[in-house]
Structures are given as structure tokens and as C-alpha cells.
């Protein structure tokens, strides 16, 4: 796993590509797993249905708190700390061999004049690219020659870096997921044919109209009461009516429909550029042409390094001091023993969440697999014998000896249809009889046309 870091002249604290890949995919893999757990729980307890309906908002709200906690006390995100990584901010990019990255390489290719092939030294753009890659490797080898000097050039992330990191870790993935979901829903062929979206829009408009009507009726009922509280309530309801009218207007506006059409045409290209940019950075990181695994790290000028013993000890000191300060803060409160226990439990949950969360998902999936295996391997009961066929009622039609004949028309059956009593007739014959008499012509058992079932026979 770490074999890419054993080469001579390389930074031993630089995470391998597989470490970066695993930590980058860790949190997105938790999201569907946790949603599945709450979906199963909501089927047994309706209280969890609210979490399922607003799962994205609940998930990213908790993720915001979790990531802030780890960025503040562990110098890295939840998944980065799980793989013993930390965020550092290099003071000098060139000293770390990152001055020549994707942007500088593109600049060299784009800014290269068209007459670059003329003169005493003729270089094509492919040669410039090769020389740029060679320069990157030389800079990296020179920078890693003195590890102590390299550590002095790094500094811890600040509060501004943590806030900016929360935008890239939580807000952007949230809005990206919402845009993907909206595009998938609106680009559905059924929605384009008006079989999905139009019905939803009509239902939404009907709900808005009903809400407006209910609010107007409530205002009229309270018009006769002169009270300051009632007046304030009426004002709030009037504002809500105006807001609902605005929503109804926006949903039916042509401008919004044009913007929606433009979005459906442009968003696939924007999403492709977004994914391609991540792929290019990951490819460059794999071949050690950059120390930035994602463009977000490049925008922030932040790199990931492995934790050393000094970092782990400093984290322990910070955590112990934090717990002591919080306990001392609530010790003077009334009922301090309860709050002291609560603070200790919350701190333990946050600090050990990197073990609790994966373990809980693993245990749940293991239990699900165990019970599903038991259901599959459990002895199955024998198939119950079919009930005996109904007997002919006195005065009922005779059953023909030739099974291919219809008891009603006494001709070979066409479009065979079975009745609730178990006898087969022609569809036109049995439909007309049941529609008129509401009973089986042989057994006189009550039936209706909805209980008739067509049979498709093989030739």
C-alpha cells in the first residue's frame, strides 16, 4: 500500500495514491449505507421517516459538525484522520516541488509562441512538456534532500482554512448532489413527455392554492377580533400568502422554464468538466507530478501529510485539555454531575466516531446478511395441495368431455378465460354471462367480471 513512497529522494510523509483514494471515497460510501439503515428502521418505526424524507439535509448537517470537530482538533477531516493524515499549509510551493503543476504546465504550452521552433534552440510543445516534467522531479528531489528544512516550511492550518475546508467538504458536495438529483429527475424521458413533471406541478399548484385558501379563511374568521396578538398573526399569515403566491408565479413563469431548459443543456458539460478536473489531478498525483490530490487542495494551497509521533502526542494533549476545560466550564452549573457526564459522553462520541461509524455500518450489514442467510437456509414448508374443484350445481351447465370446448357455446375455446370457480370458457361467452347473471354458469358461485382472468396457452 505504501510502496510508492519507498523510492529514493521521495518524501516519506507523502501519502500514497491508495491512501488518498480510500480517504476520498470513504465518506461518500457512508452516505448510501446510512440511508439504507434509516430506511429499514423507518419501516418499523415511523419516527425515522422524517430523516429518510430529508436525509441529505440531516446527513450534511451532522457531517458539518463532525468535520468541524476533526478540523479543529485533529488538523484534518474525518476520513483523513481515519487514515492518520493531517492538513498542512506550505509556506513556499517551489520548495515543495509544487510550483510546476497542472496550471503552470498548461501556461507553458499555451503561452509558447508560434515561432518556438525557430532560433538556435528549437523546442516543440511536446519537448517543453517533457522538460517541465523533468524539472518537477528535480525540484522534488532537491526539496526532499533535507527533511528538517522541509518541515520548517510547513505550517498548521488556521481558522480561515478550516472554514474554507468546510465549504469544500460539505457545502459543495451537498449542492452538487442536489443538482445531480434535479437533473436526473427533469431529464427523465417520462418528464419530457409530460407524464411526470406536469402531474407533480399540478399537484404542487393545487396544494399551494389550498394553503392560500385556508389562510384567507382563517384571516376572515379573525377579522372581528380586535387584539394585538391576532393582528400580528394576521400579518404573518398575509406574508405567508404573498410568499405562496410568489412561488406559484415562479413555477408558472416562462423565464423559469427557459432557465430550466438552459440548465438541462449546460449542466452535463459543467459536470463533465468538474469530474475531469478531479481525474486529471488524481492522475498527476499518481505519477507524482503534483502534491495536490484534488483541485480544492490546490485552491486552498493545502497538502496532506502522514501523522508522526509528535502529532499524535500533541493531539492527545489538546484533547485532554479540551475535555478538562469543558468539564470545568459546566462544573458550576446546577445539576453539574449530569452535565459533566453529558459532556464526557459527547466528547467520547465525537473522538471515537471514526471507529463507531464504520463499525456500526459493518455490524448492521452483518446482521442483515446473517438473517437473510437464515431465511434462505431455513427448511421450507411443503406446498399446500390445491383445493378440490367445485362441483356442478343442480341446474348448472354440463361439463363437456372434450376439455377444449367451451361449456357455454360448446365450441373450441377462443381467447380462453378462467372463472373464479376454476372452469375455463371463451372470453366473450363468460364475460356476457357473468355481466348479466353475476354467477358461474356451472357452479352458480357468485362472481363478477373483475374476477375473470385470461389464460395464454402455448401451442
UniProtKB/Swiss-Prot annotation:
Which residues are Zn(2+)-binding? 406, 409, 426, 429
Specify whether Nucleus is a keyword of the entry. Answer: no
Where do the TM regions start and end?
Answer: 17-44, 48-72, 159-196, 249-287, 356-380
> Which of the residues are on side Cytoplasmic?
45-47, 197-248, 381-459
Q: Which GO terms describe its molecular function?
A: ubiquitin-protein transferase activity; zinc ion binding
For this protein, the record's InterPro entries field holds: PEX12, Pex_N, Znf_RING/FYVE/PHD
Residue numbers on the Peroxisomal matrix membrane side: 1-16, 73-158, 288-355
Query: From which domain of life does this come?
Result: Eukaryota
Q: Can you say where in the cell this protein is located?
A: Peroxisome membrane
Keyword annotations for this protein?
Answer: Membrane, Metal-binding, Peroxisome, Protein transport, Transmembrane, Transmembrane helix, Transport, Ubl conjugation pathway, Zinc, Zinc-finger
Quaternary data:
Component of the PEX2-PEX10-PEX12 retrotranslocation channel.
Record-stated family: Belongs to the pex2/pex10/pex12 family.
Its name, as the record gives it, is Putative peroxisome assembly protein 12
Taxonomic lineage: Eukaryota, Amoebozoa, Evosea, Eumycetozoa, Dictyostelia
The gene is pex12
Amino acid at each position: 500500500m505504501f510502496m510508492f513512497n519507498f523510492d529514493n529522494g521521495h518524501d516519506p510523509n507523502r501519502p500514497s495514491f491508495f491512501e488518498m483514494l480510500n480517504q476520498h471515497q470513504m465518506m461518500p460510501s457512508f452516505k448510501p449505507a446510512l440511508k439504507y439503515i434509516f430506511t429499514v428502521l423507518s419501516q418499523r418505526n415511523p419516527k425515522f421517516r422524517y430523516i429518510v424524507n430529508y436525509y441529505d439535509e440531516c446527513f450534511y448537517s451532522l457531517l458539518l459538525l463532525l468535520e468541524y470537530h476533526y478540523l479543529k482538533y485533529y488538523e484534518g477531516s474525518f476520513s483523513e484522520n481515519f487514515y492518520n493524515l493531517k492538513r498542512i499549509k506550505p509556506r513556499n510551493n517551489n520548495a515543495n516541488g509544487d510550483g510546476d503543476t497542472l496550471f503552470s504546465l498548461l501556461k507553458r504550452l499555451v503561452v509558447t509562441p508560434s515561432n518556438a521552433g525557430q532560433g538556435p534552440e528549437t523546442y516543440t510543445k511536446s519537448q517543453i512538456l517533457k522538460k517541465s516534467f523533468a524539472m518537477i522531479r528535480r525540484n522534488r528531489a532537491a526539496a526532499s534532500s533535507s527533511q528538517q528544512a522541509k518541515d520548517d516550511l510547513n505550517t498548521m492550518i488556521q481558522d480561515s482554512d478550516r472554514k474554507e475546508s468546510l465549504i469544500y467538504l460539505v457545502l459543495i458536495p451537498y449542492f452538487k448532489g442536489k443538482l445531480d438529483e434535479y437533473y436526473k429527475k427533469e431529464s427523465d424521458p417520462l418528464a419530457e413527455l409530460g407524464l411526470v413533471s406536469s402531474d407533480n406541478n399540478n399537484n404542487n399548484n393545487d396544494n399551494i392554492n389550498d394553503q392560500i385558501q385556508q389562510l384567507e379563511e382563517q384571516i376572515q374568521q379573525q377579522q372581528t377580533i380586535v387584539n394585538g396578538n391576532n393582528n400580528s398573526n394576521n400579518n404573518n399569515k398575509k406574508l405567508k400568502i404573498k410568499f405562496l403566491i410568489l412561488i406559484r408565479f415562479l413555477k408558472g413563469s416562462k423565464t423559469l422554464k427557459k432557465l430550466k431548459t438552459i440548465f438541462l443543456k449546460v449542466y452535463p458539460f459543467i459536470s463533465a468538466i468538474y469530474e475531469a478536473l478531479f481525474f486529471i489531478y488524481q492522475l498527476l498525483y499518481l505519477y507524482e507530478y503534483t502534491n495536490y490530490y484534488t483541485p480544492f487542495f490546490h485552491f486552498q494551497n493545502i497538502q496532506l501529510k502522514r501523522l508522526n509521533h509528535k502529532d499524535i502526542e500533541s493531539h492527545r494533549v489538546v484533547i485532554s485539555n479540551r475535555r478538562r476545560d469543558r468539564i470545568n466550564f459546566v462544573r458550576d452549573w446546577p445539576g453539574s454531575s449530569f452535565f459533566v457526564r453529558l459532556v464526557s459522553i459527547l466528547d467520547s462520541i465525537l473522538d471515537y466516531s471514526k471507529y463507531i461509524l464504520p463499525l456500526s455500518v459493518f455490524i448492521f450489514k452483518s446482521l442483515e446478511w446473517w438473517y437473510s442467510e437464515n431465511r434462505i437456509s431455513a427448511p421450507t414448508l411443503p406446498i399446500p395441495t390445491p383445493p378440490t374443484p367445485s362441483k356442478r350445481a343442480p341446474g348448472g351447465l354440463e361439463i363437456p368431455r372434450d376439455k377444449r370446448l367451451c361449456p357455454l357455446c360448446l365450441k373450441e375455446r377462443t381467447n380462453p378465460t378462467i372463472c373464479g370457480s376454476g372452469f375455463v370458457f371463451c372470453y366473450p361467452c363468460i364475460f356476457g354471462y357473468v355481466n348479466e347473471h353475476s354467477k358461474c354458469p356451472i357452479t352458480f358461485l357468485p362472481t363478477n367480471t373483475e374476477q375473470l382472468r385470461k389464460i395464454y396457452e402455448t401451442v
